[in-house]
Protein backbone atom coordinates (compact mmCIF):
# COMPACT_ATOMS: atom_id res chain seq x y z
CA UNK A 1 0.00 0.00 0.00
CA UNK A 2 2.83 2.39 0.84
CA UNK A 3 4.42 1.69 -2.54
CA UNK A 4 1.11 2.43 -4.30
CA UNK A 5 0.71 5.72 -2.41
CA UNK A 6 4.28 6.70 -3.27
CA UNK A 7 3.67 5.95 -6.96
CA UNK A 8 0.57 8.16 -6.99
CA UNK A 9 2.38 11.12 -5.45
CA UNK A 10 5.55 10.71 -7.53
CA UNK A 11 3.53 10.44 -10.75
CA UNK A 12 1.74 13.69 -9.92
CA UNK A 13 5.06 15.43 -9.25
CA UNK A 14 6.48 14.10 -12.53
CA UNK A 15 3.52 15.51 -14.46
CA UNK A 16 3.52 18.86 -12.67
CA UNK A 17 5.20 21.65 -14.67
CA UNK A 18 6.82 22.99 -11.50
CA UNK A 19 7.17 21.88 -7.90
CA UNK A 20 8.82 22.92 -4.63
CA UNK A 21 10.09 21.06 -1.58
CA UNK A 22 10.52 21.64 2.13
CA UNK A 23 12.82 19.50 4.21
CA UNK A 24 14.20 19.11 7.70
CA UNK A 25 16.06 16.51 9.71
CA UNK A 26 15.57 15.32 13.25
CA UNK A 27 16.64 12.47 15.53
CA UNK A 28 14.20 9.73 16.49
CA UNK A 29 13.93 7.74 19.71
CA UNK A 30 16.66 5.33 18.54
CA UNK A 31 19.04 8.27 18.01
CA UNK A 32 18.82 7.80 14.24
CA UNK A 33 18.76 10.96 12.12
CA UNK A 34 15.75 11.08 9.80
CA UNK A 35 15.39 13.30 6.72
CA UNK A 36 11.80 14.40 6.08
CA UNK A 37 10.76 15.90 2.72
CA UNK A 38 7.41 17.30 1.59
CA UNK A 39 6.53 18.44 -1.93
CA UNK A 40 4.15 21.01 -3.38
CA UNK A 41 2.98 20.50 -6.96
CA UNK A 42 0.22 21.33 -9.45
CA UNK A 43 -2.41 18.74 -10.32
CA UNK A 44 -5.78 19.26 -12.01
CA UNK A 45 -5.55 23.05 -11.81
CA UNK A 46 -4.87 23.05 -8.08
CA UNK A 47 -1.84 23.26 -5.83
CA UNK A 48 -1.33 20.14 -3.72
CA UNK A 49 1.01 19.40 -0.82
CA UNK A 50 2.03 15.89 0.12
CA UNK A 51 4.58 13.77 1.92
CA UNK A 52 7.42 12.87 -0.45
CA UNK A 53 9.73 10.65 1.59
CA UNK A 54 11.54 10.06 4.87
CA UNK A 55 14.89 8.25 4.99
CA UNK A 56 17.45 7.59 7.73
CA UNK A 57 20.76 9.43 7.48
CA UNK A 58 24.28 8.40 8.55
CA UNK A 59 25.58 9.42 11.96
CA UNK A 60 26.88 12.75 10.65
CA UNK A 61 24.08 14.76 9.07
CA UNK A 62 26.31 16.81 6.79
CA UNK A 63 25.14 18.77 3.77
CA UNK A 64 26.72 16.17 1.49
CA UNK A 65 24.83 13.30 3.11
CA UNK A 66 21.51 15.17 3.03
CA UNK A 67 22.00 16.12 -0.62
CA UNK A 68 23.02 12.57 -1.49
CA UNK A 69 19.79 11.18 -0.01
CA UNK A 70 17.69 13.85 -1.70
CA UNK A 71 19.34 13.53 -5.11
CA UNK A 72 19.21 9.73 -4.94
CA UNK A 73 15.43 9.84 -4.48
CA UNK A 74 15.05 12.26 -7.41
CA UNK A 75 17.12 10.04 -9.68
CA UNK A 76 15.48 6.77 -8.63
CA UNK A 77 11.98 8.17 -9.11
CA UNK A 78 12.68 10.06 -12.33
CA UNK A 79 12.00 13.53 -10.94
CA UNK A 80 13.48 16.52 -12.76
CA UNK A 81 15.50 19.06 -10.77
CA UNK A 82 14.90 21.60 -13.55
CA UNK A 83 11.25 21.76 -12.47
CA UNK A 84 12.08 22.50 -8.84
CA UNK A 85 11.42 26.19 -8.14
CA UNK A 86 11.65 26.32 -4.38
CA UNK A 87 13.40 24.78 -1.39
CA UNK A 88 12.51 25.68 2.20
CA UNK A 89 14.74 24.73 5.15
CA UNK A 90 15.77 26.06 8.53
CA UNK A 91 18.91 28.16 8.89
CA UNK A 92 21.28 25.40 10.04
CA UNK A 93 24.79 25.56 8.58
CA UNK A 94 24.41 22.15 6.91
CA UNK A 95 21.47 23.59 4.99
CA UNK A 96 22.68 27.09 4.19
CA UNK A 97 26.48 26.96 4.02
CA UNK A 98 27.71 29.51 1.47
CA UNK A 99 29.98 27.16 -0.47
CA UNK A 100 28.88 23.59 0.22
CA UNK A 101 25.56 23.78 2.06
CA UNK A 102 22.59 21.75 0.89
CA UNK A 103 20.86 24.74 -0.69
CA UNK A 104 23.98 25.64 -2.66
CA UNK A 105 24.29 22.07 -3.96
CA UNK A 106 20.62 21.96 -4.96
CA UNK A 107 20.85 25.30 -6.76
CA UNK A 108 23.84 24.00 -8.72
CA UNK A 109 21.61 21.45 -10.47
CA UNK A 110 18.33 23.37 -10.05
CA UNK A 111 19.29 27.01 -10.71
CA UNK A 112 15.65 28.13 -10.73
CA UNK A 113 15.11 26.92 -7.14
CA UNK A 114 14.62 29.82 -4.72
CA UNK A 115 15.61 29.22 -1.11
CA UNK A 116 13.22 30.30 1.65
CA UNK A 117 14.43 30.35 5.24
CA UNK A 118 11.51 28.90 7.23
CA UNK A 119 9.52 31.94 8.35
CA UNK A 120 8.53 30.30 11.65
CA UNK A 121 12.17 29.67 12.53
CA UNK A 122 12.99 33.27 11.61
CA UNK A 123 10.20 34.52 13.86
CA UNK A 124 11.50 32.35 16.72
CA UNK A 125 15.04 33.68 16.23
CA UNK A 126 13.83 37.28 16.10
CA UNK A 127 11.98 36.84 19.40
CA UNK A 128 14.96 35.43 21.32
CA UNK A 129 16.79 38.70 22.01
CA UNK A 130 15.82 40.27 25.35
CA UNK A 131 17.23 42.77 27.86
CA UNK A 132 19.28 41.18 30.63
CA UNK A 133 16.63 41.88 33.27
CA UNK A 134 14.00 39.91 31.36
CA UNK A 135 16.43 37.06 30.62
CA UNK A 136 17.07 36.71 34.35
CA UNK A 137 13.34 36.63 35.13
CA UNK A 138 12.73 34.05 32.40
CA UNK A 139 15.53 31.80 33.65
CA UNK A 140 14.27 32.02 37.22
CA UNK A 141 10.71 31.28 36.10
CA UNK A 142 11.90 28.16 34.30
CA UNK A 143 13.75 27.07 37.47
CA UNK A 144 10.54 27.52 39.46
CA UNK A 145 8.60 25.33 37.05
CA UNK A 146 11.31 22.69 36.86
CA UNK A 147 11.59 22.53 40.66
CA UNK A 148 8.00 21.37 40.74
CA UNK A 149 7.86 19.33 37.53
CA UNK A 150 11.21 17.56 37.72
CA UNK A 151 10.15 15.39 40.68
CA UNK A 152 7.04 13.25 40.65
CA UNK A 153 6.45 13.79 44.37
CA UNK A 154 6.55 17.57 44.05
CA UNK A 155 4.17 17.39 41.09
CA UNK A 156 1.65 15.32 43.05
CA UNK A 157 1.91 17.51 46.16
CA UNK A 158 1.47 20.66 44.09
CA UNK A 159 -1.58 19.18 42.37
CA UNK A 160 -3.14 18.39 45.77
CA UNK A 161 -2.40 21.93 46.99
CA UNK A 162 -4.02 23.48 43.89
CA UNK A 163 -7.07 21.28 44.37
CA UNK A 164 -7.39 22.33 48.01
CA UNK A 165 -7.11 26.01 47.06
CA UNK A 166 -9.71 25.65 44.30
CA UNK A 167 -7.31 26.69 41.56
CA UNK A 168 -8.46 26.59 37.95
CA UNK A 169 -5.40 24.52 36.96
CA UNK A 170 -3.64 21.80 38.91
CA UNK A 171 -0.45 21.42 36.88
CA UNK A 172 2.36 23.60 35.59
CA UNK A 173 3.65 23.12 32.05
CA UNK A 174 7.23 22.01 31.52
CA UNK A 175 9.37 24.41 29.50
CA UNK A 176 11.12 23.09 26.39
CA UNK A 177 13.40 25.06 24.11
CA UNK A 178 12.54 22.70 21.26
CA UNK A 179 8.86 23.58 21.10
CA UNK A 180 8.00 26.96 19.64
CA UNK A 181 4.89 27.59 21.78
CA UNK A 182 6.28 26.21 25.03
CA UNK A 183 7.66 29.39 26.57
CA UNK A 184 4.52 31.51 26.41
CA UNK A 185 2.24 28.78 27.73
CA UNK A 186 4.59 28.04 30.62
CA UNK A 187 4.70 31.67 31.73
CA UNK A 188 0.95 32.16 31.37
CA UNK A 189 0.25 29.12 33.53
CA UNK A 190 2.81 30.26 36.13
CA UNK A 191 1.11 33.66 36.37
CA UNK A 192 -2.28 32.03 36.82
CA UNK A 193 -0.96 29.81 39.63
CA UNK A 194 1.43 32.28 41.25
CA UNK A 195 -0.28 32.20 44.67
CA UNK A 196 -0.30 28.40 44.77
CA UNK A 197 3.33 28.25 43.57
CA UNK A 198 4.44 30.77 46.22
CA UNK A 199 2.77 28.78 48.99
CA UNK A 200 4.22 25.49 47.75
CA UNK A 201 7.77 26.82 47.40
CA UNK A 202 7.53 28.36 50.87
CA UNK A 203 6.43 25.03 52.36
CA UNK A 204 9.40 23.17 50.86
CA UNK A 205 11.79 26.00 51.87
CA UNK A 206 12.87 26.72 48.30
CA UNK A 207 15.01 29.86 47.81
CA UNK A 208 12.99 30.52 44.65
CA UNK A 209 9.98 31.54 46.75
CA UNK A 210 11.45 35.03 47.18
CA UNK A 211 10.90 35.76 43.48
CA UNK A 212 7.14 35.24 43.69
CA UNK A 213 7.02 37.66 46.62
CA UNK A 214 8.89 40.34 44.64
CA UNK A 215 6.41 42.73 43.00
CA UNK A 216 8.83 43.96 40.34
CA UNK A 217 9.72 40.36 39.44
CA UNK A 218 6.04 39.49 39.13
CA UNK A 219 5.43 42.52 36.91
CA UNK A 220 8.20 41.51 34.51
CA UNK A 221 6.96 37.90 34.57
CA UNK A 222 3.47 39.13 33.67
CA UNK A 223 4.87 41.20 30.79
CA UNK A 224 6.80 38.19 29.48
CA UNK A 225 3.64 36.07 29.64
CA UNK A 226 1.73 38.71 27.66
CA UNK A 227 4.36 39.38 25.00
CA UNK A 228 5.08 35.68 24.44
CA UNK A 229 1.36 35.05 24.16
CA UNK A 230 1.24 37.61 21.33
CA UNK A 231 4.34 36.09 19.71
CA UNK A 232 2.69 32.66 19.98
CA UNK A 233 -0.37 34.02 18.17
CA UNK A 234 1.89 35.19 15.34
CA UNK A 235 3.64 31.81 15.35
CA UNK A 236 0.33 29.98 15.09
CA UNK A 237 -0.87 32.21 12.24
CA UNK A 238 2.27 31.34 10.26
CA UNK A 239 1.57 27.62 10.57
CA UNK A 240 -0.80 25.63 8.40
CA UNK A 241 -1.01 24.37 4.86
CA UNK A 242 -1.10 26.16 1.51
CA UNK A 243 0.63 29.31 2.72
CA UNK A 244 2.55 31.47 0.28
CA UNK A 245 4.91 34.42 0.45
CA UNK A 246 2.16 37.06 0.49
CA UNK A 247 0.10 35.59 3.35
CA UNK A 248 3.24 35.08 5.44
CA UNK A 249 4.42 38.64 4.80
CA UNK A 250 1.01 40.04 5.75
CA UNK A 251 1.12 38.32 9.15
CA UNK A 252 4.64 39.54 9.91
CA UNK A 253 3.92 43.08 8.70
CA UNK A 254 0.83 43.21 10.91
CA UNK A 255 2.87 42.17 13.94
CA UNK A 256 5.59 44.73 13.20
CA UNK A 257 2.98 47.48 13.04
CA UNK A 258 1.56 46.31 16.36
CA UNK A 259 5.06 46.62 17.85
CA UNK A 260 5.15 50.24 16.70
CA UNK A 261 1.78 50.90 18.34
CA UNK A 262 2.79 49.16 21.58
CA UNK A 263 6.04 51.13 21.79
CA UNK A 264 4.13 54.39 21.45
CA UNK A 265 1.60 53.44 24.14
CA UNK A 266 4.24 52.21 26.59
CA UNK A 267 6.01 55.53 26.10
CA UNK A 268 2.81 57.23 27.28
CA UNK A 269 2.60 54.94 30.32
CA UNK A 270 -0.25 52.79 29.00
CA UNK A 271 -0.09 49.00 29.49
CA UNK A 272 -3.62 48.08 28.38
CA UNK A 273 -2.33 45.83 25.53
CA UNK A 274 -0.68 43.63 28.19
CA UNK A 275 -3.65 42.49 30.35
CA UNK A 276 -1.70 40.23 32.72
CA UNK A 277 0.80 42.99 33.44
CA UNK A 278 -1.96 45.57 33.84
CA UNK A 279 -3.67 43.29 36.37
CA UNK A 280 -0.43 42.88 38.37
CA UNK A 281 0.22 46.63 38.38
CA UNK A 282 -3.31 47.24 39.62
CA UNK A 283 -3.10 44.64 42.40
CA UNK A 284 0.35 45.68 43.62
CA UNK A 285 -0.13 49.44 43.11
CA UNK A 286 3.17 49.54 41.22
CA UNK A 287 3.53 52.53 38.88
CA UNK A 288 3.93 51.66 35.16
CA UNK A 289 7.23 53.53 35.21
CA UNK A 290 8.74 50.70 37.30
CA UNK A 291 8.89 48.45 34.21
CA UNK A 292 8.53 51.04 31.47
CA UNK A 293 12.21 51.25 30.52
CA UNK A 294 12.70 47.47 30.36
CA UNK A 295 9.57 46.96 28.25
CA UNK A 296 10.48 49.80 25.89
CA UNK A 297 13.97 48.34 25.42
CA UNK A 298 12.51 44.91 24.69
CA UNK A 299 9.93 46.17 22.20
CA UNK A 300 12.54 48.25 20.40
CA UNK A 301 14.80 45.20 20.28
CA UNK A 302 11.97 43.13 18.81
CA UNK A 303 11.39 45.77 16.14
CA UNK A 304 15.07 45.74 15.19
CA UNK A 305 15.24 41.94 15.10
CA UNK A 306 12.12 41.60 12.97
CA UNK A 307 13.48 44.23 10.58
CA UNK A 308 16.74 42.27 10.32
CA UNK A 309 15.16 38.86 9.76
CA UNK A 310 12.29 39.90 7.50
CA UNK A 311 13.10 43.21 5.83
CA UNK A 312 10.59 44.86 3.52
CA UNK A 313 8.44 43.11 0.93
CA UNK A 314 9.79 43.64 -2.61
CA UNK A 315 7.32 45.59 -4.73
CA UNK A 316 8.22 43.82 -7.96
CA UNK A 317 5.73 40.98 -7.39
CA UNK A 318 2.71 43.02 -6.31
CA UNK A 319 1.04 42.39 -9.67
CA UNK A 320 0.72 38.73 -8.65
CA UNK A 321 -1.26 39.56 -5.53
CA UNK A 322 -3.56 41.95 -7.39
CA UNK A 323 -3.15 42.16 -11.18
CA UNK A 324 -5.88 44.82 -11.28
CA UNK A 325 -4.08 47.33 -9.05
CA UNK A 326 -0.34 47.39 -8.42
CA UNK A 327 2.53 49.92 -8.29
CA UNK A 328 3.89 51.05 -11.64
CA UNK A 329 7.38 49.96 -10.55
CA UNK A 330 6.19 46.34 -10.60
CA UNK A 331 6.15 46.49 -14.40
CA UNK A 332 9.94 46.81 -14.48
CA UNK A 333 10.36 43.07 -13.88
CA UNK A 334 8.03 42.12 -16.76
CA UNK A 335 8.90 41.48 -20.38
CA UNK A 336 6.91 43.23 -23.11
CA UNK A 337 4.90 40.07 -23.76
CA UNK A 338 4.10 39.68 -20.06
CA UNK A 339 3.18 43.34 -19.67
CA UNK A 340 0.81 43.18 -22.63
CA UNK A 341 -0.83 40.03 -21.26
CA UNK A 342 -1.20 41.66 -17.84
CA UNK A 343 -2.77 44.74 -19.43
CA UNK A 344 -5.34 42.55 -21.17
CA UNK A 345 -6.02 40.51 -18.03
CA UNK A 346 -6.46 43.58 -15.83
CA UNK A 347 -9.13 44.92 -18.19
CA UNK A 348 -11.36 41.86 -17.78
CA UNK A 349 -13.96 42.56 -15.08
CA UNK A 350 -15.10 38.92 -15.00
CA UNK A 351 -11.58 37.90 -14.00
CA UNK A 352 -11.56 40.62 -11.35
CA UNK A 353 -14.62 39.03 -9.76
CA UNK A 354 -13.00 35.60 -10.05
CA UNK A 355 -9.99 36.82 -8.04
CA UNK A 356 -12.34 37.81 -5.21
CA UNK A 357 -14.03 34.40 -5.18
CA UNK A 358 -11.02 32.05 -5.14
CA UNK A 359 -7.54 31.75 -3.62
CA UNK A 360 -4.77 33.49 -5.50
CA UNK A 361 -3.10 30.23 -6.57
CA UNK A 362 -6.31 28.89 -8.10
CA UNK A 363 -6.90 32.20 -9.85
CA UNK A 364 -3.55 32.12 -11.64
CA UNK A 365 -3.99 28.46 -12.57
CA UNK A 366 -7.47 29.22 -13.92
CA UNK A 367 -6.11 31.77 -16.43
CA UNK A 368 -3.25 29.54 -17.61
CA UNK A 369 -4.82 28.78 -21.00
CA UNK A 370 -5.56 32.45 -21.74
CA UNK A 371 -2.42 34.02 -20.27
CA UNK A 372 0.20 31.25 -20.06
CA UNK A 373 3.25 33.48 -19.63
CA UNK A 374 2.05 35.59 -16.69
CA UNK A 375 0.34 32.57 -15.12
CA UNK A 376 3.60 30.60 -15.18
CA UNK A 377 5.57 33.56 -13.83
CA UNK A 378 3.09 34.04 -10.98
CA UNK A 379 3.08 30.36 -10.03
CA UNK A 380 6.88 30.29 -9.85
CA UNK A 381 6.57 32.87 -7.06
CA UNK A 382 3.61 31.20 -5.33
CA UNK A 383 4.72 27.55 -5.44
CA UNK A 384 7.64 27.69 -2.92
CA UNK A 385 6.93 26.80 0.72
CA UNK A 386 7.44 29.55 3.29
CA UNK A 387 7.88 27.26 6.32
CA UNK A 388 8.82 23.71 7.30
CA UNK A 389 5.56 23.34 9.22
CA UNK A 390 4.61 20.10 7.43
CA UNK A 391 7.97 18.54 8.31
CA UNK A 392 7.42 19.45 11.96
CA UNK A 393 4.02 17.74 11.80
CA UNK A 394 5.73 14.76 10.22
CA UNK A 395 8.24 14.55 13.06
CA UNK A 396 5.38 14.64 15.56
CA UNK A 397 3.91 11.63 13.75
CA UNK A 398 7.34 9.98 13.80
CA UNK A 399 7.54 10.22 17.60
CA UNK A 400 4.06 8.72 17.83
CA UNK A 401 4.77 5.78 15.52
CA UNK A 402 8.39 5.06 16.45
CA UNK A 403 8.38 5.16 20.23
CA UNK A 404 10.46 3.45 22.91
CA UNK A 405 8.41 0.28 22.53
CA UNK A 406 9.04 0.14 18.77
CA UNK A 407 12.47 1.72 18.55
CA UNK A 408 13.72 -0.70 15.87
CA UNK A 409 10.80 -0.08 13.53
CA UNK A 410 11.60 0.81 9.91
CA UNK A 411 9.19 3.70 9.88
CA UNK A 412 9.26 4.93 6.28
CA UNK A 413 6.25 2.99 4.94
CA UNK A 414 4.18 3.59 8.07
CA UNK A 415 4.85 7.32 7.88
CA UNK A 416 3.83 7.44 4.23
CA UNK A 417 0.47 5.82 4.91
CA UNK A 418 -0.06 8.00 7.98
CA UNK A 419 0.93 11.35 6.45
CA UNK A 420 0.10 11.18 2.75
CA UNK A 421 -3.23 12.55 1.52
CA UNK A 422 -3.22 9.93 -1.26
CA UNK A 423 -5.19 6.78 -0.50
CA UNK A 424 -4.08 3.25 -1.44
CA UNK A 425 -5.95 1.95 -4.50
CA UNK A 426 -7.16 -1.25 -2.86
CA UNK A 427 -9.08 -2.55 -5.90
CA UNK A 428 -6.08 -1.90 -8.14
CA UNK A 429 -3.78 -3.69 -5.71
CA UNK A 430 -6.10 -6.69 -5.45
CA UNK A 431 -6.54 -6.90 -9.23
CA UNK A 432 -2.78 -6.84 -9.77
CA UNK A 433 -2.24 -9.98 -7.68
CA UNK A 434 -1.72 -13.02 -9.91
CA UNK A 435 -2.55 -15.51 -7.17
CA UNK A 436 -4.93 -14.34 -4.42
CA UNK A 437 -4.34 -15.66 -0.92
CA UNK A 438 -6.84 -18.29 0.13
CA UNK A 439 -8.22 -18.41 3.64
CA UNK A 440 -6.79 -21.04 5.95
Model regions and ranges:
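Alpha-helical structural modules in large enzymes and assemblies
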Residues: 1-440
Amino acid sequence: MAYDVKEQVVNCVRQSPIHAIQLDESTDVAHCAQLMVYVRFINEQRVHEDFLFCVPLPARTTADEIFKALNEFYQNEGLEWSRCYGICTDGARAMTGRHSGLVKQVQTIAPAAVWNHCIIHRQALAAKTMPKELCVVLDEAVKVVNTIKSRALNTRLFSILCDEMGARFKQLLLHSEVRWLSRGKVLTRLCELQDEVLLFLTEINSPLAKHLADMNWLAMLAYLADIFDKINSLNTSLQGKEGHVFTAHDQVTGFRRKLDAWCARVGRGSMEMFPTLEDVLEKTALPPSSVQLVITAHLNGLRDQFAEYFGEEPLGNQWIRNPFSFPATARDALSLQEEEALAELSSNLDLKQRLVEMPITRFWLSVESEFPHVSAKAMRVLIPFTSTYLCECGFSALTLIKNKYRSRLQVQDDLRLFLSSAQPRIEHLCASKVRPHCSH
